[in-house]
Amino acid sequence: MATYTCITCRVAFKDADIQRAHYKTDWHRYNLKRKVADMPPVTAENFQERVLAQRAVAEERDKVTATYCTVCSKRFSTFNAYENHLKSKKHLELEKKAVQAVSKKVKILNEKNLEKGLAVESVDKDEMNAAIQQAIRAQPSSSPKKVPLPPSHASSSPVPMESAGLLQSKERTQKPPRLQWFEQQAKKLAKQEAEEEEDSEEGWEEMDSDEDLGSEEEMEGVEEEEEKQAEAESTCAIGAIPVTDCLFCSHHSRTLMKNVAHMTKVHSFFIPDIEYLVDLRGLIKYLGEKIGVGKICIWCNEKGKSFYSTEAVQAHMNDKSHCKLFTDGDAALEFADFYDFRSSYPDHKEGQDMEVPAELPSDRELEYDDDTMELIPPFRCKSWSSFFNEILQAAVWSVKNGGCY
């Protein structure tokens, strides 16, 4: 009596090796699926009949699919019609002409090779013709291949300007805005370095005491050029976020101070080493260009993913709590132009970090703080640390009293 059986297929085996081999067959897997579906198993003969029937259906489906003759440029709905077309007189004539055309091209290429000194291997003409005929013979395909238009048609039907513009815009969008912005910054740095080298090479020119510095018209022209240059530097780049707009949302403030207060309170925006910051406007303007033009997160920088809209960058920074500057290691050098750390040096002496004019202009009034009555000299701004302390105190007071700041 056989002791090795398969309960799923309801069969018995003589030894364990045949039983293990049975577990790997498609018949056993098929019966397992039927068992899961609460269906009775099938015998081995019935399974083979099902497999053959499925193969016949697949072959019939392949024959029914649409076929295309590349020589005659015709499509046929059934495989039988396609086979009858291959035996037709018209198709055979076109195929013969195609073979002659290809043979002519091969002959021309062989003549050119002989002129260049390249030896042509001796090949039987019958074999060559058979190979050419087999190569160009129409093969069944599901869909016809698109044939490119000849140059005459291409020139007679020019591409519309709108489609050309779309193609150009697609080519532009292939390069991420972040990469474009980094390239612009690299060009600016290279230009600044080149200008500094030119200035150092030119040096100072000695002038005689008798020579004049120039007429008044020349001085006015120089002043106008300086004013134009200052205006050009003050204007924001295309797409940059203005200094009065929030870097992380669509909020607009009347002044830069109110904008910084909004970002500090709502988005927990934090500027490191605020006591050494000397150019707040320049820093906010730079961050506005970085987010608006470069579409870059100020915390992820080049390590994060690429964004293609300002709204996407702002949403990312708000969702990930990246409303802060990344200043670890060498990353702090990015903002070095907006800070002045000379007051933190051990050998620093008061008054060395700025040039105090000998006499103040008589037409300039001194400013003072309304709360502390502290004088604010015209050549020095109020401490940013005290400014942020006032913002935080006002925010705490508004939270305690349930009001809005």
From Swiss-Prot:
Function comment: Pre-60S-associated cytoplasmic factor involved in the cytoplasmic maturation of the 60S subunit.
GO MF: nucleic acid binding; preribosome binding; zinc ion binding
Gene Ontology CC annotations of this record: cytoplasm; nucleus; preribosome, large subunit precursor
Protein source organism: Gallus gallus
Keywords, sorted A to Z: Cytoplasm, Metal-binding, Nucleus, Repeat, Ribosome biogenesis, Zinc, Zinc-finger
Taxonomic classification: Eukaryota, Metazoa, Chordata, Craniata, Vertebrata
Xref: PANTHER family: CYTOPLASMIC 60S SUBUNIT BIOGENESIS FACTOR ZNF622, ZINC FINGER PROTEIN 622
Main location: cytoplasm
InterPro entries: Matrin/U1-like-C_Znf_C2H2 (IPR003604), ZN622/Rei1/Reh1_Znf-C2H2 (IPR041661), Znf622/Rei1/Reh1 (IPR040025), Znf_C2H2_jaz (IPR022755), Znf_C2H2_sf (IPR036236), Znf_C2H2_type (IPR013087)
Biased composition (Acidic residues): 194-228
GO biological process, one term: ribosomal large subunit biogenesis
Name by which UniProt lists this protein: Cytoplasmic 60S subunit biogenesis factor ZNF622
